[in-house]
Swiss-Prot record:
This protein's name: Testis-specific chromodomain protein Y 1
A Pfam family annotated for this UniProt entry: ECH_1
Record-linked InterPro entries: Chromo-like_dom_sf, Chromo/chromo_shadow_dom, Chromo_dom_subgr, Chromo_domain, Chromodomain_CS, ClpP/crotonase-like_dom_sf, ECH/Chromodomain_protein, Enoyl-CoA_hydra/iso
Catalyzed chemical reaction(s): L-lysyl-[protein] + acetyl-CoA = N(6)-acetyl-L-lysyl-[protein] + CoA + H(+)
SUPFAM superfamilies for the chain: Chromo domain-like (SSF54160), ClpP/crotonase (SSF52096)
GO molecular function, one term: transcription corepressor activity
Subcellular location: Nucleus
Chain intervals for the UniProt region annotation (Disordered): 76-106
């Protein structure tokens, strides 16, 4: 599968919202400044290293400011000492006995003028930046020199033996390079990912079999010299190896990072959340992470609020599922960012498009939803859903089409279709009665009853309920255990469970979508949805 990777380039800023919760301004690599987003701290649980580095850099800025103030004080004191020493020299050279003749007075004036010139020269020396660096070196130990030698071999700088003391004081990055692989410099500009191989450099054969360790400062310093590439695993650089940032470690090919960094520009590139794209197209409303043995699809919509579904979001999810079906992933983890899992269809979006041309727009939207539901029905690999918050409408009705549903204890589930002014979708007209009985299904589909996570688990809509504080950790532990199983066994188990109801689900999806098309193509149906959009109350 041809793919590119886009990651968090840096955490730019930090703030507190009106509720006192911490938020970080995240800059995505490959995106412009205007695409920066404020993310709550809980969204960055897989990027704790990145958050830690940002906080540490803020602390070091404060220390640097204090050091600059100290240097200025030292500079002023040095000027005073120089002035005093000049005056002392002048007093020694001046006559000690009073003279009254003009000859001696002219000599005194010359000496005084000379002393003024000395003071001016001393002040100019102290004000010069290069000279001040020499002076400041007496009060603070200089950083060790770069371990790179300036000699080159065929356009590449060679590595000299490292100072063992300097090496112990710096972070170690383990690398392994394979001959003939193209590497991408992670310190290149944000848009470099989308420009093909313009910023990739061919590894010289003399360096092809090198394996060992280099310091982070070496990799950082190499970015400023021509003909130098950062030595990382070529498979990881080309996007063909699994990479993730699960807490508490960072994993990426052959790279291993020890946590005592003082080389922020290099380290911040090593802690990231991956955005995976196929055929050089970027997902806008979801984040796809290629993990070890499974693919995680995170619903994180930008075009809608509260992870609502419109045609663009639905198409991105379908594309991500089709890609996961074709790659070597054993299963799929479907989750969401924020406090809401999914609030169903974005009816404001649907009303806006249905107003222009009801017949054509309703047919296109129904086909999109039909394809979306059929993708879940026909997906051969197991789908695990991590429900972190409220699941409403289509966000709840697709859950029975998945294989395992793990819910946060604060999550709740509701399908108030009559309130929406539409009919059931997502095969809920058949899955809900089979799962929880007709009475409970009618309570949800017609009366719009809300189920807590515990109630949903008791009725079979949810597999397990986890505590809020350990929800993410529990999900990752269990999903990694599932990913360690034989993929053939996983697929065959799902096939045996679904074989008797697959055709029935497809027929139910066809019926539901036909009813939706009739409602959306009618004036009464649009009016009902518009009334809901105008009168809906924010429950979150």
């Amino acid at each position: 599968m041809a793919s590119q990777e886009f990651e968090v380039e840096a955490i730019v800023d930090k703030r507190q919202d009106k509720n006192g919760n911490t938020q970080y301004l995240v800059r995505w690599k490959g995106y412009d400044k205007q695409d920066d987003t404020w993310e709550p701290e809980q969204h960055l649980m897989n990027c704790e290293k990145c958050v830690h580095d940002f906080n540490r850099r803020q602390t070091e800025k404060q220390k640097k400011l204090t050091w600059t103030t100290t240097s200025r004080i030292f500079s002023n004191n040095a000027r005073r000492r120089t002035s005093r020493s000049t005056k002392a020299n002048y007093s020694k050279n001046s006559p000690k006995t009073p003279v009254t003749d003009k000859h001696h007075r002219s000599k005194n004036r010359k000496l005084f003028a000379a002393s003024k010139n000395v003071r001016r020269k001393a002040a100019s020396i102290l004000s010069d930046t290069k000279n001040m660096e020499i002076i400041n070196s007496t009060i603070e130990t200089l950083a060790p020199d770069s371990p790179f030698d300036h000699k080159t071999v065929s356009g590449f700088q060679k590595l000299e033996k490292l100072d063992p003391i300097a090496a112990d004081q710096q972070d170690t990055v383990v690398f392994k390079v394979t001959e003939g692989k193209l590497l991408r410099d992670p310190l290149s500009r944000p848009g470099a990912e989308q420009t093909g191989i313009q910023n990739k450099t061919q590894i010289h054969p003399l360096m092809s079999q090198m394996s060992g360790s280099v310091t982070a400062s070496m990799a950082t310093g190499s970015a400023t010299r021509k003909g130098i590439v950062v030595l990382i695993d070529p498979l990881a650089a080309n996007g063909t190896t699994d990479m993730h940032t699960s807490v508490p470690r960072v994993k990426g090919g052959q790279r291993n990072i020890t946590d005592d960094s003082r080389d922020q520009p290099f380290i911040k590139k090593m802690h990231f959340t991956i955005r995976l794209t196929e055929s050089a197209s970027t997902y806008r409303d979801i984040v796809v992470k290629k993990e070890d043995g499974f693919t995680q699809i995170v619903l994180s919509t930008r075009s809608t609020e509260k992870n609502a579904l419109n045609t663009e979001v639905i198409k991105e999810i379908v594309n991500a599922l089709n890609s996961a079906a074709a790659d070597d992933s054993k299963l799929v983890l479907f989750s969401a960012a924020g406090s809401v899992f999914c609030c169903g269809l974005d009816f404001g979006y649907f009303v806006k498009h249905l107003r222009n041309n009801r017949n054509t727009a309703s047919l296109e939207m129904v086909d999109t939803i039909k394809n979306f539901v059929n993708t879940f029905i026909q997906f051969k690999k197991p789908i695990v859903v991590s429900v972190n918050g409220p699941a409403i409408g289509l966000g709840a009705s697709i859950l029975p089409l998945c294989d395992l549903v793990w819910a946060n204890e604060k999550a709740w589930f509701q399908t108030p279709y009559t309130t929406f002014g539409q009919s059931p979708d997502g095969c809920s007209s058949i899955t809900f009665p089979k799962m929880m009985g007709k009475a409970s299904a009618n309570e949800m589909l017609i009366a719009g009853r809300k189920l807590t996570a515990r109630e949903a688990c008791a009725k079979g809509l949810v597999s397990q309920v986890f505590l809020t504080g350990t929800f993410t950790q529990e999900v990752m532990i269990q999903i990694k255990e599932l990913a360690s199983y034989n993929p053939i066994v996983l697929e065959e188990c799902k096939a045996l469970v679904r074989c008797n109801i697959k055709l029935e689900l497809e027929q139910a999806n066809e019926r539901e979508c036909e009813v939706l098309r009739k409602i959306w193509s009618s004036a009464q149906g649009i009016e009902s949805m518009l009334k809901y959009v105008e009168n809906k109350i924010d429950e979150f």
